[in-house]
């Protein structure tokens, strides 16, 4: 089975074509600047050949048409025609409370995605554009929707409810949803394999650390707590997001600075985090370099980030009543040995000790803990596209079996 995985953003469309026979990526591509001047599509195939093409991409449909051309190109393509693609898997950020798993796309699923537009106004609408374009260009090809929020639907009510009047939850769906679910699920499953235990018997803390960051407590293979909340703003300090703060700061700053609701939202989401503290950058590599040269604000930004992660690891150790492993993944989690060390230093009291030399190894799954550590620490590169492809394959094959078992 060949699965096309699509992640549509407001002005971009990422894609991978994965051969599920051996779970290998045949082609990886990106359409950028959709609806903007100087649009470009880039695609790299399994043998290293790379296509770069400047072209007009007014809409997501135009972008997907270019994807079709690239995948079937005589020189840079990897298939003869789109009929070789058996299914399409789409990433959708928000599924609300309606989806605890991925779902085969139909009119009901489409309505549910649109119902969540107000919960994820920056993400669900462009996700839907990608789905609609695909339905038009590849009619008859089954599509599976994989929701970022679905993995966290196993949280108990006392974990996902806020201590606000209950009717606000009933009327507006105000509760914790959590995000990065596909990544957290993937690395938790990999960690269980590295532990040599069935997922049902594990307690794992997964740390997805990138420009957007979240931490999840996974017990028995299920999410029981996560750091992001009603929106991805809650939780850790991030690249440009402030994370959890005293809510009273919001009206205080609106009054003192004369800010509108949109302006305070922009301040917290786009101008805060390590960028806001450092006044320099949201790129942790820049901050690492600046801090090493004595930039105090860059150092403070890194200290705040590491401290918040450390607190959540301790908190989730309590939630799980002890953890078997802590996992680091995503851009920072996988690649920054210095930030991992900042986070993990001083956690020997809860059984975490790391080997400094192992911690410096990059680009592979590795146990960086010392032999005598009670809690294993794994660095596991995430692969959300493969996770989406696996979900897509499973759901499509299950649906085919169900249909074939129904008597005519």
Curated annotation (Swiss-Prot):
Substrate binds at residue 91. GO terms for molecular function: acetate kinase activity; ATP binding; magnesium ion binding. Changing residue 179 to A: Decreases affinity for acetate. Gene3D superfamilies: 3.30.420.40. Belongs to the acetokinase family. Catalyzes the formation of acetyl phosphate from acetate and ATP. Can also catalyze the reverse reaction. Can also phosphorylate propionate, but has very low activity toward butyrate. This is Acetate kinase.
């Amino acid at each position: 089975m060949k699965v096309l995985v699509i992640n549509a953003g407001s002005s971009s469309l990422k894609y991978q074509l994965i051969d599920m026979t051996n779970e290998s990526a045949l082609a990886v591509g990106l359409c950028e600047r959709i609806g903007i001047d100087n649009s470009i599509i880039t695609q790299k195939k399994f043998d290293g050949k790379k296509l770069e093409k400047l072209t007009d991409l007014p809409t997501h449909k135009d972008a997907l048409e270019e994807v079709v051309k690239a995948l079937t190109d005589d020189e840079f393509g990897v298939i003869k025609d789109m009929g070789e693609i058996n299914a399409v898997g789409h990433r959708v950020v928000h599924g609300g409370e309606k989806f605890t798993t991925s779902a085969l796309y139909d009119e009901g699923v489409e309505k549910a995605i649109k119902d969540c537009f107000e919960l994820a106004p920056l993400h669900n609408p462009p996700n839907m554009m990608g789905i609609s374009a695909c339905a038009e260009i590849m009619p008859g090809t089954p599509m599976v929707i994989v929701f970022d929020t679905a993995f966290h639907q196993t949280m108990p009510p006392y974990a996902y409810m806020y201590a606000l009047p209950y009717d606000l939850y009933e009327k507006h769906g105000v509760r914790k949803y959590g995000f990065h679910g596909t990544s957290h699920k993937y690395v938790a499953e990999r960690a269980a394999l590295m532990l040599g235990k069935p997922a049902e018997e594990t307690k794992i803390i997964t740390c997805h650390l990138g420009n957007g960051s979240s931490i999840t407590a996974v017990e028995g293979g299920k999410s029981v707590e996560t750091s992001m909340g009603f929106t991805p703003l809650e939780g850790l300090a991030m690249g440009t997001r402030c994370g959890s703060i005293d809510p009273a700061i919001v009206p205080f700053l609106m009054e003192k600075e004369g800010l509108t609701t949109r302006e305070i939202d922009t301040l917290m989401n786009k101008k805060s985090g390590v960028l806001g503290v450092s006044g320099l950058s949201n790129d942790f590599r820049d901050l690492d370099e600046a801090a090493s040269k004595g930039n105090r604000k860059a150092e403070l930004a890194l200290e705040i980030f590491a401290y918040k992660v450390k607190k959540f690891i301790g908190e989730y150790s309590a939630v799980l009543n002890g953890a078997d492993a802590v996992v680091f993944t995503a851009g920072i989690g996988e690649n920054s040995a210095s930030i991992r060390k900042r986070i993990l230093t001083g956690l020997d009291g809860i059984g975490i000790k790391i080997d400094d030399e192992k911690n410096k190894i990059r680009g592979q799954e590795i146990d960086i803990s010392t032999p005598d550590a009670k809690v294993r620490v794994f660095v596991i590169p995430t692969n959300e596209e493969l996770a989406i492809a696996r979900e897509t394959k499973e759901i499509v094959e299950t649906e085919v079996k169900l249909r074939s078992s129904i008597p005519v």
